[in-house]
Design a protein with these regions (language model features):
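Extended, subdomain-level signal for the structured scaffold at the beginning of enzyme domains
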Residues: 1-65, 77-89, 97-147
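Short, thiol/selenol-centered motifs that function as redox-active sites or metal-ligating centers
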Residues: 72-74
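Active-site-adjacent substrate-recognition loops and nearby beta-strands
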Residues: 93
Length: 147
């Protein structure tokens, strides 16, 4: 089951029940050569996924291959744990900003609807930036999105 976050009133965010998904993926079975890019979502899961050694290895493999990587909201917590942000500009949910700085990256505060691109990396601070991060990720992938 997923959780969704929203910005309401004076709270930093509120959490609501999201969607039910059957999880069938196995991190140990991931071959990064089979993927053109990596998109790390936010929410609460990055706090726990960054403790999984294979998740860290996957991120490091994508960066070593200079493949496109996107991370939104709390997603950059995984990037900081993977030690791949040195010298990179990135944004995130504001509470993750100090983690980016401590990992040697440059935290860039932007509006929640914006994204920051630095080389193969695109980041956004929260779900209002879904359009911006997706647009930039598609560009990094070398794809076109037409309606």
């Amino acid at each position: 089951r997923t959780a969704t976050h929203d910005f309401e009133g004076e709270q930093t965010y509120s959490e609501k029940r999201g969607h039910n998904f059957a999880l069938t993926a196995d991190f140990d079975a991931v071959n990064t050569a089979d993927y053109a890019g990596l998109f790390i979502t936010g929410g609460r899961s990055p706090e726990y996924l960054r403790l999984t050694p294979r998740v860290i290895e996957i991120v490091q493999e994508f960066f070593a291959a200079n493949k496109p990587v996107a991370a939104i909201c709390h997603g950059p917590q995984i990037l900081t744990a993977a030690n791949v942000l040195k010298g990179k500009k990135a944004t995130a949910y504001p509470a993750v900003g100090p983690d980016i700085t401590l990992a040697g990256g440059e935290y860039v505060a932007v509006d929640a609807s914006e994204a920051v691109v630095d080389g193969n990396l695109v980041t956004a601070p929260a779900w209002p930036g879904d359009s911006a991060i997706t647009r930039e990720f598609i560009k990094l992938m070398g794809a076109k999105w037409e309606l």
